[in-house]
Curated annotation (Swiss-Prot):
Name listed for the protein in its UniProt record: UPF0426 protein asl4034
Source organism (scientific name): Nostoc sp. (strain PCC 7120 / SAG 25.82 / UTEX 2576)
Family the UniProt entry places it in: Belongs to the UPF0426 family.
Length: 72
């Protein structure tokens, strides 16, 4: 039935109304969440900086070039 197909949508609407309506509005307005105005606003709302920090991996004293392995 038609009601059975819509029940997951109503369930999500009841459980998380703000996120559901936000996702619905962004879908209706065809907003791309990766575009700069929307992305910077979302980052500001979450408290995340838009710039990235350099990642430093620990190499345990080994060189960062190609390494050979042997498979038995």
């Amino acid at each position: 039935m038609f009601i059975d197909e819509l029940s997951p949508i109503f369930k999500q609407l009841v459980q998380h109304p703000a996120s559901f309506l936000g996702g619905f509005a962004s879908g209706v307005l065809r907003l791309n969440l990766a575009d700069d105005p929307v992305k910077s606003w979302l980052d500001k709302q979450r408290g995340v900086n838009s710039y990235s920090f350099p990642v430093t991996d620990a190499h345990n004293g080994k060189a960062s070039g190609p390494q050979s392995i042997s498979i038995d």
